[in-house]
Amino acid sequence: MTDPNPQIRPARPHQKLLDDGRTVREVLTYTRRGSRLDAKQQKAWDAYAAEWVIPDEAVDEPGFSLESWFGRKGPLIVDIGGGVGEATAVLAANRPEANILALEVWRPGVAESLARVGAAGATNVRFCSVDALWTLENLVEPVSVSEVWTFFPDPWHKTRHHKRRLVTPTNARMIAERLAPGGIWRLATDWVEYAEQMVEVLDAEPLLSGGVVERWDERPVTKFERKGLAKDRVITDLLYRR
């Protein structure tokens, strides 16, 4: 673990306070959105959340173990920002031997993902809504991950927001360190300039090698991707290996 004492972890995002009690202003890779569920989402939540969703407060408990939430050993795949689970459900069903940790902060998205994963008959996904970078750094052991999936992360296209992008040198190093030898980081984006930055950042990371690749045929075309294609955006797939 990053912290040498597993009983004590850094405060999670939204919990870091100054001495006067004010919340620390943080640079996050996502925006906060509403958490209210509609009737269909609530039904999925009620059906699956108790078994498949890791409560936020659970990660603060001494001795927290990801493996215990899966109830078995298996190759660990981390899905960062899976949205409503269109890709997560299909890929999880195709990888029944893998333990898939789906990191998504938007609660309605988690609820829709639960419905899709359940409909796909996949029982190997556990959802966590704690900040993905904090989770990777503090809950995921180095050299323990077989794959990381980062499909269509927010491009934060305004220059002043580029600091909020997920793929930065600091984040790339931390994620690369979580990959086992031979582990893979798969990415996709419909924003050409972000794809170029991804290549620049990941090519410069000495733990990784790879680049732009043909579209991964196992990755389903999601509603989000179809919208990008309808706007004539170029979809770029990347693969880097440790």
What are these regions (language model features)?
Residues 83:
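Conserved glycine-rich SAM-binding loop
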Residues 80, 103:
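Conserved beta-strand/loop positions that form the S-adenosyl-L-methionine
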Residues 106:
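Conserved SAM/SAH-binding beta-strand->alpha-helix loop
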